[in-house]
Design a protein with these regions (language model features):
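Extended intrinsically disordered terminal tails
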Residues: 1-148
Length: 148
């Protein structure tokens, strides 16, 4: 009797790793979108603060724009908390977001391919097991030999 041993090489760790990578990418995307929003708001506030230098009465200008000054300070602190000391351009942030979205899409596609392969391997394994069970039944109950 020939015995065939098949090795099914699907690695469930790969599926889990893909899930972890997708979660990491989602987190990074969320962070980058917050940074983008903060940077855009910071630029607007920064313009108001720079305009104070050319205002005829800087003290009155500052009191009229106190909200922008407070927002500027809080945005500056938040951006520093993200490790940003130099404000990146909008294009640079958007490119980073686009790259993350592309990487996430690619990872999702890879995960779907892994799942398809796993399904195929499961079917092959079931068929192989059924075939072995059929052969074992046939071997344990041999057909009676015909006599002449």
């Amino acid at each position: 009797m020939n015995v065939f041993i098949f090795s099914f090489n699907f690695n469930p760790v790969s599926d889990k790793a893909a899930d972890q990578k997708i979660a990491q990418l989602n987190s990074e995307l969320s962070t980058q979108k917050i940074i983008q929003k903060h940077c855009d708001s910071y630029r607007l506030c920064r313009k108001v603060i720079e305009d104070a230098k050319s205002a005829p009465n800087p003290t009155a200008y500052r009191s009229r724009h106190q909200a922008e000054y407070q927002l500027h300070d809080s945005l500056k602190k938040e951006l520093q908390d993200f490790g940003i000391t130099k404000i990146p351009s909008s294009e640079k942030i958007q490119k980073r977001i686009d790259n993350l979205v592309s990487e996430k899409t690619s990872t999702i596609r890879e995960k779907q391919e892994l799942r398809k392969k796993q399904l195929t391997l499961d079917i092959i394994q079931q068929n192989f097991s059924a075939l072995l069970n059929t052969q074992n039944i046939a071997l344990s109950h041999p057909l009676p030999e015909e006599t002449l």
